[in-house]
Each structure stands twice: as structure tokens, then as C-alpha cells.
Amino acid sequence: MTIALGKFTKDENDLFDIMDDWLRRDRFVFVGWSGLLLFPCAYFAVGGWFTGTTFVTSWYTHGLASSYLEGCNFLTAAVSTPANSLAHSLLLLWGPEAQGDFTRWCQLGGLWTFVALHGAFGLIGFMLRQFELARSVQLRPYNAIAFSGPIAVFVSVFLIYPLGQSGWFFAPSFGVAAIFRFILFFQGFHNWTLNPFHMMGVAGVLGAALLCAIHGATVENTLFEDGDGANTFRAFNPTQAEETYSMVTANRFWSQIFGVAFSNKRWLHFFMLFVPVTGLWMSALGVVGLALNLRAYDFVSQEIRAAEDPEFETFYTKNILLNEGIRAWMAAQDQPHENLIFPEEVLPRGNAL
């Protein structure tokens, strides 16, 4: 930071400039303007999650035990969504539901909205942090653009989907087993695995894993012979100007393997950015569609034929029956307030039974 001698003018002593200088100065942990959003929101979201999983029951919202205090472990504890009867209430601590009573607020599921909203703004703050730092050191903003993928998925699953349904109740609770249950719910009620947006998301994420593995292995395979260091990380000076691996050798190797190969580093790395981020965006779009109850692929002709012909069955018709079973079980289990009772004759049976 440059210090100029002399009197400050009004412009130089402006409060914004003082704040800007303090927030953006070089320190071990960069704060920045984005930090005003990121750090408080991340602190409250993580703190709320630890508080909920440690102490707070889901008995009043789901009829479940969900905390360490009740005997759950890391995989089964969760911060559960509010009850279906509370619809889309923000469940503010000082609102009409809890009326300032912290214990009642926790019992009603107030920690879920607290964690979800602070978590969403915390993620947005982290993306803005990447924008801010990139601008400060004159980098392109592709890191921030890439991080918009996870943000889109989080916002679509935890906020937009339940907003399209009857309440926060149908969002995922914040816990490992709770997320698994939500995945089963998505399959049973939306046939999510047959949704083309889910297919694009899977292709993006798994394709990105494949690209990452291939890229890392190829770079390791084509490293130039280096110094005496015991491993790759010590052998090179991190500030050296020369390349550490041979793009030409890598190109020739993959040209022989596949017949085609990336010949340009920018295109190769853009492709590695494009595949996973596009997959995440497509998944988020698909979840927005589910919020509106848009359907996945339906092969009705196969369903009709399977219903008429006891000897005809496909993997698709078997999965449809499985979805019906999930719905019949989950609806009664998850929504006891609806008093849903399914007689035996309406429960799904495969032709093989």
C-alpha cells in the first residue's frame, strides 16, 4: 500500500475508500467486499447445521429422530425441513409461528430455512469472492463462472423445487441419509433417472471425472525429466518460466490411441470446464422443471401392452411399477397427516408376480 505525505482531501478521506482499502488489502485470508456476504452467511449456515444435527429433533416435523442427542450418527443426523402445514413460511425467529421462542423455532424446523437461505447466500458470496480476486489480479472470471454450476444445483434443489411444491417440507433435509431419501423420492414421484436433464447431468459429472483422470495421468506421463527432488512437487521451481510437460508428446500419444487428440491447451482446458459446468446447469434446469411437475419420458405404449399381455415386460415397465411402489410407501410414511391408506389391490404388482 502506498502512503502519500500531505493532507487528505475530502475525496481521499471518503468512507468508501477507507473501507475499500481495509477490505481489499493483502493479508493471509483475503476479505474483500464479497467477504461481507460470504463470511457471516457461511458461519451461520455451518453453525446452524452443527447445532441442528447435534441437538434438534425432527419429531414435530417428520416424526423422526435426527440428532446426535437422540442417538443418530453422522450419516443419519440431519437438519430437517419444516412440516408440510407451514407451507413456504420463512419461519423467522420473531415471526408469528415461533414468536421469539428459540426452542419452539427449532421444533418447527426454523433451522432448515436458516441454513438453506444463509447457505445459498454464502455460496453466492464465494462466487463473488472469486470474481473480486480475479479482477484484483487481472485474471479472467472463469472460476466464478464455473462455480455457478454448483450454485444453480443448490438453489434449484433446495429452494426452487420446494417453492414449486406445497412447501419447504418437500425439499431435502440437510443430512446424508436424508439426501438419499430425497433421491428415492425424486425417482418415485418424478421418474428422475429417465429425465433427459438428469441424463445430461450424469454425462457431465462422470464425463468430467473421466477427463480429469485422463488429463492428470497424461500430464504425469509426459513430465520432462527433472531435478533430484523425491517427487514431482519438489522437483520443479513453482516460478519457473518453462513448461513442465510435453504437449506434443501427449498429442501424439492420444492421436495414436483414438485417432484424434487436443492440439491446443486452451481448447482442452475449456472443454474440461465446459463438460461438468454444463452438466450441472442442465441438472438444475431439470429440477426447475420438476418444481413445475413436468414429466420425464413416458413410453405409454409399453405400459399399455404390459398391462394387457402378462408375458410382456420391459425394464421400463418394471421401473414404472417400482416407482409406484415407492410412491405408495413414501406417501403414507412421509405424509401421515394426510391419513393415506392404500388397499392391497391398488399396490403395484409386476407381471412376474
Swiss-Prot record:
It is a multi-pass membrane protein. Chlorophyll a PD2 binds at residue 198. It catalyses: 2 a plastoquinone + 4 hnu + 2 H2O = 2 a plastoquinol + O2. GO terms for molecular function: chlorophyll binding; electron transporter, transferring electrons within the cyclic electron transport pathway of photosynthesis activity; iron ion binding; oxygen evolving activity. The keyword Acetylation applies. PROSITE patterns: REACTION_CENTER. Keywords: Acetylation, Chlorophyll, Chloroplast, Chromophore, Electron transport, Iron, Magnesium, Membrane, Metal-binding, Oxidoreductase, Phosphoprotein, Photosynthesis, Photosystem II, Plastid, Thylakoid, Transmembrane, Transmembrane helix, Transport. A plastoquinone binds at residues 215, 262. The chain crosses the membrane at residues 41-61, 125-141, 153-166, 208-228, 279-295. Photosystem II (PSII) is a light-driven water:plastoquinone oxidoreductase that uses light energy to abstract electrons from H(2)O, generating O(2) and a proton gradient subsequently used for ATP formation. It consists of a core antenna complex that captures photons, and an electron transfer chain that converts photonic excitation into a charge separation. The D1/D2 (PsbA/PsbD) reaction center heterodimer binds P680, the primary electron donor of PSII as well as several subsequent electron acceptors. D2 is needed for assembly of a stable PSII complex. This is Photosystem II D2 protein. It comes from Antirrhinum majus.
